[in-house]
């Protein structure tokens, strides 16, 4: 990674992957350094981005330190024995290092690296939550007011998003309403 961003603009993105004030806030704060402007724009869209999220932490030392360096994508030997890319999460040090990609999950470090890998460690170590690659939805019976929450654990590219965004079938009429909570990663 050393020297790979020479001559490029480095961006500092302070972010929060949970609602401010939630019980999960201490595990959700991070700072991503990246040399990739589209990564910054996508992080702004995907997460809560502001310095205030770090300033409001009870223990400011707990934020995740994430570094993404795009690298020379054409010459990194992807898919060969000489592959120079690496994607590392050192969970007990709250550190993420990704080199050699501009692909979403490998560049938007708040998502898979922090939101899933780091959070799996944090949840287990704290005993306070579970982080999984789940979709979450709710089904409301408008007639009775009953609400059912459904959690589905599926691997990537298996239909979590399609299922999470489903509508009640026409055969059930207007009695049921489906609420979308999330389609990829859940902290429960």
What does each model-found stretch correspond to?
Residues 1-158, 168-188:
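Conserved internal helical-beta-strand scaffold that buttresses enzyme catalytic cores
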């Amino acid at each position: 990674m050393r020297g790979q961003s020479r001559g490029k603009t480095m961006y500092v993105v302070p972010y929060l992957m949970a609602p401010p004030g939630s019980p999960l806030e201490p595990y959700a704060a991070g700072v991503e350094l990246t040399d990739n402007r589209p990564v910054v724009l996508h992080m702004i869209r995907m997460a809560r981005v502001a310095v205030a999220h770090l300033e409001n932490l009870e223990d400011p030392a707990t934020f995740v330190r994430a570094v993404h360096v795009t690298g020379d994508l054409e010459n990194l030997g992807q898919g060969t024995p000489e592959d120079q890319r690496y994607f590392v999460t050192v969970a007990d040090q709250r550190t993420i290092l990704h080199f050699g990609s501009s692909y979403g999950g490998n560049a938007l470090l708040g998502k898979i690296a922090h939101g899933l890998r780091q959070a799996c460690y944090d949840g287990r170590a704290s005993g306070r939550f579970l982080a999984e690659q789940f979709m979450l939805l709710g089904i409301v019976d408008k007639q009775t007011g009953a609400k059912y929450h459904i959690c589905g654990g599926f691997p990537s590219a298996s239909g979590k998003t399609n299922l999470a965004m489903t509508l009640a079938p026409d055969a059930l009429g207007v009695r049921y309403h489906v609420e979308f909570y999330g389609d990829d990663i859940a902290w429960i």
